[in-house]
Amino acid sequence: MAVKRYNVRMAGLGGQGVVTASHILSNGVVISGGHSSLVPFFGSEKRNAPVESYVRISADEIYEIGEIIYPNIIMIFHPSVITLGKSYTMPFYTGLKEGGVCVINTGKPIPFTKDEQKGLEVNNTKVYNVP
């Protein structure tokens, strides 16, 4: 059975465009005939503070709002979300569904801790580093 719904969690730092990217993704889904909802989450700080945004994508109507606890896809906009723990959700892969995807904005692979590596392997997570 094909997946009819995707939950995307985006994490980065203030000023990187995490919220803008979630709006673009959500609007693209709606324009193409799908259903989408998004919820940005950030503090009162301006730049370099943790930012998360949650996008739900579905072929059917969406009634849920709020934080996505169990995403299919995690997008990391800055390596420090992982290396310095600059995220509201730690460790960064928390809740990722089995067979999930993690896209990291970096030109070279990030050295994960043993616990992070084990957590990703247990879930059969595909990690992509995209510069």
What are these regions (language model features)?
Residues M1-P131:
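Active-site cofactor/cluster-binding pocket
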